[in-house]
Amino acid sequence: MNDKPTVPEILRSGAQTYEERNRIYGDNYKQAGALLKVLFPDGLPPMDADGWNRFGVWLMVFGKAVRYAAQLQNGGHKDSAHDAMVYAAMLEELTDE
């Protein structure tokens, strides 16, 4: 007997997760590009590995902020706020200054 999920089961589960999250956040993931273009109009600067680590963690904070903004009119989204706090602490650890 195999308890591992099959590919179709995994895909159905993923679709269910997408639908649940989309009800909460909407299509906010489609806004990230426009927002990042405003923040980085000249593109990203060259970075070493440490810089890319900082950018990667900052991008996680950014993603949670975008998700939180999608729920701002409904009182916010505690999970996104909590996750952003954790990522911000990770970013502080990586900050040189």
Stretches with model-predicted labels:
Residues 1-97:
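Intrinsically disordered, low-complexity regulatory regions
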